[in-house]
Amino acid sequence: MSRAYTSDPRVLAIDPSTRGFGFAILEGPNRLIDWGVKETKTDKRKRSLKLIADLIEQYQPSVLVVEDYTRKGSRRCRRVRELIKDISRLAVQQKIKVRSFSRLKVKQAFSESGASNKYEIALAIAERFPELAARLPRFRKPWMSEDYRMGIFDSVGFALNCFSFSSPENISA
């Protein structure tokens, strides 16, 4: 995707999961360019890195955002933690800045708007970006698995944190 002139940095946020990864591309805090979930069934690490490299090539982000899995509250399995490291290395190799935020940081940012859990954060994101409303999973009961589409909302949350907590010179190309 060719990049139209804008003073806002383009941010690619990735949220790996056991099924693949959710992603969101934002240009500034109010312009959602693309979003989705990429599923990987075999050779998940290699396939995920290939799909992420394709997103980087297509959208040419100035910043890549991932979860800071080292912080309290992260429950990532070893494979996903290793994948996050590999994603960060891929971005650095392509001279893209890498930022990471804990889920707690995202929760704190959205608590100002009254959102206190992942579902309420997703609702707040869908309100901010109505184009995501159709992808909003229904409320999850304790015995239910998390809907794969939640990766989209987690990614948008990470990207918005990048704009909220980073100084402009740290996210500009």
For each feature predicted by the language model, list its residue ranges.
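Phosphate- and other anionic-substrate recognition elements at nucleic-acid/protein interfaces
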Residues: 1-173
